[in-house]
From Swiss-Prot:
The keyword Flavoprotein does not apply. InterPro entries: Ribosomal_bL9, Ribosomal_bL9/RNase_H1_N, Ribosomal_bL9_bac/chp, Ribosomal_bL9_C, Ribosomal_bL9_C_sf, Ribosomal_bL9_N, Ribosomal_bL9_N_sf. Belongs to the bacterial ribosomal protein bL9 family. One of its GO terms (cellular component) is ribosome. GO terms for biological process: translation. Pfam families: Ribosomal_L9_C, Ribosomal_L9_N. Binds to the 23S rRNA. It comes from Mycolicibacterium vanbaalenii (strain DSM 7251 / JCM 13017 / BCRC 16820 / KCTC 9966 / NRRL B-24157 / PYR-1) (Mycobacterium vanbaalenii). Keywords: Ribonucleoprotein, Ribosomal protein, RNA-binding, rRNA-binding. This is Large ribosomal subunit protein bL9. SUPFAM superfamilies: L9 N-domain-like, Ribosomal protein L9 C-domain. One of its GO terms (molecular function) is rRNA binding.
Length: 151
């Protein structure tokens, strides 16, 4: 099935890209969520408009992403106190991307979307220092050290 993306889809493309996907993936995932439209002549014109708008936004987006990167990497330490931790350093719950976003904001950093946070695994389940990657733009990624402590 030939589709034109209307939003960025990881491992597939950016808005305006014409992609060939399996029918089930297109019908059951991309189309219902509004991430793509069926490729027709009119849709191709619409994709060109989307691509032009994306190019204008990307310059502004790249500059903004670099500013956010400097703000995030300028934070001296981001500490997250977790109430439920065993003496061995293992958490009874887990630290999610939303918890990391709240910790960054509390430390004086910018307000981020939880989908931009790249955890080492799906969740953090131990205390100590963990390296976090924040994907701000396809070309800009900020690195951050999160210290999880029992509180």
């Amino acid at each position: 099935m030939k589709l034109i993306l209307t939003a960025e889809v990881e491992h597939l493309g950016v808005p305006g890209d014409a992609v060939e996907v399996k029918d089930g993936y297109g019908r059951n995932y991309l189309l219902p969520r509004g991430l793509a439209i069926v490729a027709t002549r009119g849709a191709q014109r619409q994709a060109d408009d989307i691509r032009r708008a994306q190019e204008l936004k990307s310059v502004k987006g790249l500059e903004h992403a670099n500013e956010l990167k400097q703000a995030i990497e300028g934070l001296e330490s981001v500490e997250l106190a977790v109430k439920t931790a065993a003496d061995s350093g293992k958490l009874f719950g887990s630290v999610t991307a939303a918890d990391v976003v709240a910790a960054i904001k509390k430390a004086g950093g910018p307000n981020l979307d939880k989908r931009t946070i790249g955890l080492p695994k799906a969740h953090i389940k131990t205390t100590g220092a963990h390296d976090i990657a924040v994907r701000l733009h396809p070309e800009v990624t900020a690195a951050l050290s999160l210290n999880v402590v029992a509180g």
